Amino acid sequence: MKLFSLASQPFLVTLCLSLLLISCAQTPVQAEVKLDAQFEKQVLEVIRKNPEVVLESLRAYQQQEQLKAQQAQKTGFQKFKTDPKAAIGQSPTYGNGKLLLVEFSDFQCPYCASARINLKTFVDRYPDRVKLIYKHFPLTQIHSEALPAAKAAWAAQQQGKFWDYHNALFDQQKTLNDETYGAIAKTLNLDIAKFNRDRTSPQATRAIEADQKLGESLGIEGTPFMVFNGEPLSGAVPVAELEKRLTSAK
């Protein structure tokens, strides 16, 4: 005879989750918790005789957590719309509009290179309606030059040449290296000594990390990723789609 029927699912779930949570505890205080032997035996028996209920309960729990994460993500996206000053921060901007188009990008990402063209075309068409904000999101696990390139672009920003440097990096994406960063800086007539100091400074590191942490807090995992007027977009979004979003923007 089963210890519990399916009708007793809430109690069953409590027992199962109690065992799972306590058995997975890692802190010293939690490690000292000892389960009553009979209670543990009951829970294990429940799991053995009612695996379908356990799986169903875990699936329901995962769905609840996903919904919570999605809601938190949506709230984060909306903050770009409700608090534009905070969204911009110290990031470089392009265009003078009130509708914010926040881009998370990686200079070594080929899809970001395609997105760059679409975004420039779009903002150039609607400069009084849209403002593009660039956020660094170097995918360092797969792009070895993404972080050095981001720091070089940040250094160029300190001399008012971010977008020119940004465009040059994407134009030379296949040959990104230290020599390239210096050559672009010379072409743009930057103060080379200052440029080199800035790109290797703690301030550059902190600025890039701040953008990365912001992206991670929003659940962003890849690039290019955009938030236009509080709504997420991913990939090299076509100009036509951006215009469609602009038409419906409030």
Model-derived segments and their meaning:
Residues 15-16, 101, 186:
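Secretory-pathway extracellular proteins and peptide precursors enriched for disulfide-bonded cysteines
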Residues 12-23:
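Bacterial N-terminal signal peptides
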